[in-house]
Amino acid sequence: QNDAIRELDLNNPVASYDNNGVFQDTLSYNRLFDADKPRTFDRKLREALGYDPNGTDWLDIDSYDPSTFSLDMFSANELLNIGSNAYVSYYGYDYLGNQLTTRPSLNDFYGTDAQGNSKRLIGAFEPIYMAGYIQDQFTFEDLFFNIGVRVDRFDANQSVLADPFVLYPAYTVGDLASTSLSGAQVPQGMSDDAVVYVDDLENPSAIVGYRDGFTWYTANGDIEANPKNIADASGGIKPFLKQPGVEEQKLSVTADESFKDYTPEVTVSPRVSFQFPISDEAEFFAHYDILVSRPDPSLNRFNPITYLQMENGDNGDLLANPDLRPQRTTDYEIGFRQVLNENSALKLSAFYKEQRDMMQTVSLTEAYPITYIAYGNLDFATSKGYTVAYELRRTGNVRMNANYTLQFADGTGSGANSGANIARSGQPNLRYILP
């Protein structure tokens, strides 16, 4: 409040005179009105109070009754308070709490209204999930088979960063021929999709490194485990930006290139089980399954406000990743079942389970414009073991089921946040196995 009149009009002093016209050695200054200050709330409050919306009257907010104010006096940016703690959080609604009747695009988020205020419209999280399966049971002599296949298709149905390491469009090796560095020597075998890093953002004259996905390379093409070494070679990480100085224009200019649509994931999951008798009182069984599960929505939802904060130098704490893939579990089991008598049976089995693409925190070290931590499909785990089960059917007043499992488990984390402290350490490529 009053931000537009905090400064004094030093170019137009007001002299003080007594009744006889004698100068009193005192100069005072009126408030200087700054029309460039964002001031939606200030302007609307002045209008509600009957003041000139562009006037210099000083308003004491604490002196007014709360009923004087309303939420629609604010702009979206004023309530989002980018660079500090937000006053509102929303998606599927506008910042005033009105439900959206259409699905806004990314351009609607960066677009402005008739007063020039950013709309900041954020659509609801509406992933598209489809699945289908076919299964058949049949016997062949003494063999009993249960065979099927399931197909899952997951589409997060939202925008994702085109490159999680660079917020703005950057040149790749394949683009160099049309740039000022067309004569640069590129190491043999370097992918055309590798992002180029240079010595200067505004006037690059040399290449200092490359990055292909999450793999970094020196200017000579050698794999670099620590991207900080590439950053140090140029006094800070400097991707070869297509629009130098774009930081002053922000993502509102580059949104169409900085983001892309989520690529749907299609998973084919075969499932096979069979069993056959060894004798009249014993049988052998086995199965093989692949299962998939969708990402946690709280870790997967696209929130464009996140990238506004990154542009302002705020990397948050743990950021959601709209580009997460489904998690996969592969399960094997073989076993033997023996009838002990007409009322009891014993089951012995061995199992192996492998889990891939599980959620874990990932440090995007030397991302541009700021290093940040997000969730990724990084974790894996394996478990194997044996199970002994005994079943006693009701005999008199006794019925019993007992089992014992011996399991050995290894993994890179016990939960999505178990690696957060390591990610915060700023050290790239640190992984560990538990236990």
Question: What positions do the PLM features span?
Answer:
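Composition-driven recognition of long, C-terminal low-complexity regions enriched in serine/threonine
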Residues: I147, T254, S258-F259, P264-T267, ...
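Transmembrane beta-barrel architecture of outer-membrane proteins
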Residues: A124-G132, F140, V151-S159, P264-P270, ...
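Transmembrane beta-barrel domains of outer membrane proteins
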Residues: Q135-T139, S273-Q275, G335-R337, A389-L392, ...
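Signature of Gram-negative outer-membrane beta-barrel scaffolds
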Residues: Q1-P277
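Membrane-embedded beta-barrel scaffold of Gram-negative outer-membrane proteins
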Residues: P277, E283-P295, L299-R301, T306, ...
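Flexible, surface-exposed loop regions and adjacent strand-edge segments
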Residues: N2, A162-T172, A177, A255, ...
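Gram-negative outer-membrane beta-barrel transporters
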Residues: K347-P435
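Extracytoplasmic loops and strand-loop junctions of Gram-negative outer membrane beta-barrel proteins
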Residues: G111-R120, P244, K250-S258, G313-A320, ...
